[in-house]
């Protein structure tokens, strides 16, 4: 355990950031899963609507540094390819 005051604060702030990042990643997984389920069901309109939300959330997560920008781009590209193949 840290003894220095500033380090104690860093431990607290790091834990808050960790909790926030876990929540954002969990939400991302949910939106991506909804998009994949819509693709699997064959409903192109629902898939495109879900993809619009998922793409926006991926960009937000990349902007906040939760995931890398390339990872967001790769995931969006993969989902877009699947939707276009419908």
From Swiss-Prot:
Stretches with biased composition (Basic residues): 1-11
Gene3D superfamilies: Ribosomal protein S20
Keyword Signal: no
Keywords noted in UniProt: Ribonucleoprotein, Ribosomal protein, RNA-binding, rRNA-binding
Record-level GO BP terms: translation
Keyword Ribonucleoprotein listed: yes
One Pfam family here: Ribosomal_S20p
A GO molecular function held by the record: structural constituent of ribosome
Cellular component terms (Gene Ontology): cytosol; small ribosomal subunit
UniProt region (Disordered), positions on chain: 1-20
Purpose of the protein: Binds directly to 16S ribosomal RNA.
Record-stated family: Belongs to the bacterial ribosomal protein bS20 family.
PANTHER family cross-referenced by the UniProt entry: 30S RIBOSOMAL PROTEIN S20 (PTHR33398), SMALL RIBOSOMAL SUBUNIT PROTEIN BS20C (PTHR33398:SF1)
Protein's name according to its UniProt entry: Small ribosomal subunit protein bS20
Higher taxonomy: Bacteria, Bacillati, Actinomycetota, Actinomycetes, Bifidobacteriales
């Amino acid at each position: 355990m840290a003894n220095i005051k500033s380090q104690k604060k860093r431990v607290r702030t790091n834990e808050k950031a960790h909790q926030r990042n876990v929540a954002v990643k969990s939400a991302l997984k949910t939106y991506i899963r909804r998009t994949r389920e819509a693709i699997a069901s064959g409903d192109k309109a629902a898939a495109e609507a879900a993809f619009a939300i998922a793409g926006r959330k991926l960009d937000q997560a990349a902007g906040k540094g939760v995931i890398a920008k390339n990872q967001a781009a790769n995931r969006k590209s993969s989902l877009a390819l699947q939707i276009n193949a419908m």
